[in-house]
């Protein structure tokens, strides 16, 4: 400005100069004078800075909740938990999983050292309790989850045994006394288990039917196993699902429809009644029907005709089927007459949906199964186990199946349970599975897919920044977590990653010394993130904004001012 206070440069010229500067230089220039300060806060200037700095596609609009481009730039720059503030070294082996309590006051960690540790989440994190599971013949702990009122902790682990053993167990721990309340068998161990209600949990069991055919049974268990009467259940069978081609059900979780932003159900039963299960195939442009619409109506005649065609073809030498392919074909045909179709139900936002990984072509989990849980199924009350078994419907049909054409290595729900985020390592385009025991090779890049559980559609392009290197038969789970604005995941490249959910951009890489297995946002404070690694550490990360607040010098308390009359009286001559 000149001496008279008038600007020497018009605002438009200052604006053009500021466009050529980076964000830090714009803010520094804004300290020179009032004119530059006003221009440095211009909305159009910060819109341009935002798209250029974060490399967001121009057709992506500003976040609906944002009030200005400047504040939105600041949110992504200053409020992402990317500053390491604490490293926890109490575990002595690889740390596999982290989970927060719903209040955010505590979190739990599982490790190859076979302990479940419970931590106090204060400004400085401290260890509250450590439960050693080796006396129960566990090899290691792998997963944990707090119940809704944070009074109980579900801990899942793997039994000691031969390398090919798939048995595990779920333990329920009281968070008041840290007493072990109950133990439930869980097979295969990577079902993990989950809470359905505050006092009931879901576990799995596996029954072999053939070499590559099996049946997964999902059980509802009471967390308190005291038996008051022989006529009262502590366990109840939820679903029985057929597995083909060496596949099994794994990674169960529950989505609560009542937490959706709108009252629409994930599955509108009034529209879907009578329709077969549908496969939403991400590898093609159309939806393909999973079953022939006439299968349920043709009954045993259809099954007999199908079996006769298969066997005649084999005997005549026309069908060159391997033993595995023949077993799968026969199992499919036999199941058609013994599978109960999905139950119809009036729209009810109290319903919950069981979500899990599965498959139909190979043992590699390449599909997401979704099964509606009706209100009457959410309790162990009902006929005592063994009663009411007269139906021919041996298996339960799924309500939805989503095929991702890749190996699923992680899943997580958004806080409102509407969006499902999936870590997947893709198969090569056009892959054909000829042998269920030899799935296609998987990509080193991990795709983070997003599905809207209201519409059963993929809603975002895949996020890709993190990597994994292990082959199919050694592939392990990479746990992810979702907060209000961010999604985070571990990776095998020794980093954790954070993306913005709206803009689909990677915001931070969080360094470890080995594979990052799990991440967890505080449910009450998304500017705090925990990461767990094979380097046997847990790291706590906070946003730059929170770090500044915590490190700011606290002013000394001033002497309490005396009232004017008291001050005046003491100074009278």
Curated annotation (Swiss-Prot):
Phosphorylated at Ser-151 by PLK4 during the G1/S transition, leading to inhibit its ability to ubiquitinate SASS6. Ubiquitinated and degraded by the APC/C complex during mitosis and G1 phase. Signal peptide: none annotated. Residues 3-49 form the F-box domain. GO terms for biological process: proteasome-mediated ubiquitin-dependent protein catabolic process; protein ubiquitination; regulation of centrosome duplication; regulation of mitotic nuclear division; SCF-dependent proteasomal ubiquitin-dependent protein catabolic process. A motif (D-box) lies at residues 308-316. SMART domains: FBOX, WD40. It is found in: Cytoplasm. Widely expressed in adult and embryonal tissues. Coiled coil: none annotated. The modification Phosphoserine is found at residue 151. WD repeats lie at residues 90-129, 470-509, 511-551. Its main location: cytoplasm. InterPro entries: F-box-like_dom_sf, F-box_dom, FBXW5, WD40/YVTN_repeat-like_dom_sf, WD40_repeat_dom_sf, WD40_rpt. GO terms for cellular component: Cul4-RING E3 ubiquitin ligase complex; cytoplasm; SCF ubiquitin ligase complex. PANTHER family: F-BOX/WD REPEAT-CONTAINING PROTEIN 5, F-BOX_WD REPEAT-CONTAINING PROTEIN 5. The F-box domain mediates interaction with components of SCF (SKP1-CUL1-F-box protein) complexes, while WD repeats mediate interaction with components of DCX (DDB1-CUL4-X-box) complexes. Belongs to the FBXW5 family. This is F-box/WD repeat-containing protein 5.
């Amino acid at each position: 400005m000149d001496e008279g206070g008038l600007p020497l440069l018009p605002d438009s010229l200052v604006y053009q100069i500021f466009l050529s500067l980076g964000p830090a230089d714009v803010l520094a220039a804004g300290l020179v004078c009032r004119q530059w300060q006003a221009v440095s806060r211009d909305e159009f200037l910060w819109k341009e800075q935002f798209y250029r700095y974060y490399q967001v596609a121009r057709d992506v609009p500003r976040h609906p909740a944002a009030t200005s481009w400047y504040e939105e730039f600041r949110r992504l720059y200053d409020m992402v938990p990317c500053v390491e503030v604490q490293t926890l070294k109490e575990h002595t082996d690889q740390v596999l999983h982290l989970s927060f309590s719903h209040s955010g006051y505590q979190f739990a960690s599982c490790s190859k050292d076979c302990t479940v540790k419970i931590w106090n989440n204060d400004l400085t994190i401290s260890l509250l309790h450590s439960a050693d599971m080796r006396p129960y013949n566990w090899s290691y702990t792998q997963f944990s989850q707090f119940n809704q009122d944070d009074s109980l902790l579900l801990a899942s682990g793997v039994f000691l045994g031969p390398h090919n053993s798939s048995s595990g167990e779920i333990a329920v721990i009281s968070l008041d006394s840290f007493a072990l309340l109950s133990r439930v068998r869980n097979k295969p161990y990577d079902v993990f288990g989950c809470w359905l209600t505050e006092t009931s949990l879901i576990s799995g069991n596996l029954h072999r039917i053939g070499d590559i055919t099996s049946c997964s049974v999902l059980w509802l268990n009471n967390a308190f196993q005291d038996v008051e009467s022989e006529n009262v259940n502590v366990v109840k069978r939820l679903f029985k699902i057929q597995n083909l081609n060496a596949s099994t059900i794994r990674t169960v979780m529950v989505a609560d429809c009542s937490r959706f932003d709108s009252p629409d159900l994930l599955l509108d039963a009034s529209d879907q009644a009578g329709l077969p299960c549908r496969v939403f195939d991400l590898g093609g442009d159309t939806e393909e029907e999973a079953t022939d619409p006439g299968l349920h109506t043709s009954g045993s005649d259809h099954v007999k005709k199908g079996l006769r065609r298969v066997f005649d073809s084999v005997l005549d030498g026309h069908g060159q089927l391997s033993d595995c392919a023949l077993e799968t074909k026969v199992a499919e045909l036999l199941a058609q007459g013994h599978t109960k179709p999905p139950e119809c139900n009036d729209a009810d936002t109290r319903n919950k949906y069981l979500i899990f990984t599965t498959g139909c072509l190979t043992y590699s989990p390449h599909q997401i199964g979704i099964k509606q849980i009706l209100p009457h199924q959410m309790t162990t009350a009902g006929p005592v186990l063994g009663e009411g078994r007269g139906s021919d419907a041996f298996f339960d049909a799924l309500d939805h199946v989503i095929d991702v054409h890749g190996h699923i290595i992680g899943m997580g729900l958004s806080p409102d349970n509407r969006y499902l985020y999936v870590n997947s390592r893709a198969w090569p385009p056009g892959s054909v599975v000829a042998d269920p025991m030899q799935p296609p090779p998987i990509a080193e890049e991990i795709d983070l897919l997003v599905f809207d559980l209201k519409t059963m559609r993929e809603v975002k392009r895949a996020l890709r920044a993190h990597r994994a290197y292990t082959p199919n038969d050694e592939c392990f789970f990479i746990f992810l977590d979702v907060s209000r604005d961010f999604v985070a995941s571990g990776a095998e490249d020794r980093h954790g990653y954070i993306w913005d959910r709206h803009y689909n951009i990677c915001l931070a890489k969080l360094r470890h010394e080995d594979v990052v297995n799990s991440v967890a946002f505080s449910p009450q404070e998304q500017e705090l993130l925990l990461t767990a690694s094979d380097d046997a550490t847990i790291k706590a990360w906070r946003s730059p904004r929170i770090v500044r607040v915590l490190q700011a010098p606290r002013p000394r308390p001033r002497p309490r001012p005396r009232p004017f009359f008291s001050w005046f009286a003491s100074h009278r001559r």
